[in-house]
Regions:
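Phosphate-group recognition and catalysis centered on beta-loop-alpha active-site segments
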Residues: 1-161
Length: 161
C-alpha cells in the first residue's frame, strides 16, 4: 500500500472564508496560516483558458455578470474578485490556473484541482485542465490531485494525463 503523499489539512478555495475564495490573496493568506495544500475550482473561459472560480456564474464572487464560461479570458482577467468579500480585498483579480499553479510550485504547496466545468463542456474541461497540470507539474515528485463531481470531466482528465 502506498502512503498518502499529500498533507492531511487542505485549505478550501485558498483560505476558506478569510479572504475572497479562489484568489491568489486567499492562497497567500492560507499559506501564512500554515497550510501547505490547497483546493481550488478550475473552469475554462470561452477561449479555453483555465481559471479559478467556483460558481457557474460571476455575480456572487466578482463584479461580473452572466455565465463565466461564456466570457473570454481578457474580460475575466479584468474583473474584481475581492470587493464582494470586503473593501480590504478590492481589486483582487480572478486568477488563471497557471498563476495559481506557479505560486504553489514556487512555494512547495500541494494542490487539489477540482474540475468545475461549464455545463456541456465537462469532458473538454477535464482534458484541458489535465494537460495544463501535466505540463506544469512535469518532473515534480508529487503531482496535483485532480477531482470533480462530474464523471465526464474526470474521464476527459484520465485520457489526457
Amino acid at each position: 500500500m502506498t502512503t498518502w503523499p499529500y498533507p492531511y489539512w487542505i485549505a478550501h478555495r485558498g483560505a476558506g472564508k478569510l479572504a475572497p475564495e479562489n484568489t491568489l490573496a486567499a492562497f497567500r493568506l492560507g499559506a501564512a496560516h500554515g497550510y501547505r495544500m490547497f483546493e481550488c475550482d478550475v473552469k475554462l473561459s470561452a477561449d479555453g483558458v483555465p481559471f479559478l472560480l467556483h460558481d457557474a456564474t460571476l455575480q456572487r464572487t466578482s463584479n461580473g455578470q452572466g455565465t463565466a464560461g461564456d466570457q473570454p479570458w481578457a474580460t475575466l482577467s479584468q474583473l474584481d474578485a475581492g470587493s464582494w468579500h470586503s473593501r480590504a480585498w478590492a481589486g483582487e483579480p480572478l486568477p488563471s490556473f497557471e498563476a495559481v499553479a506557479r505560486y504553489c510550485l514556487r512555494n512547495g504547496h500541494a494542490l487539489n484541482i477540482e474540475i468545475k466545468p461549464t455545463p456541456g463542456a465537462e469532458r473538454l474541461t477535464g482534458e484541458v485542465v489535465a494537460r495544463h497540470a501535466a505540463r506544469l507539474w512535469a518532473g515534480q515528485a508529487t503531482p496535483p490531485l485532480l477531482t470533480s463531481f462530474q464523471p465526464d470531466a474526470l474521464e476527459g482528465a484520465r485520457h489526457s494525463a
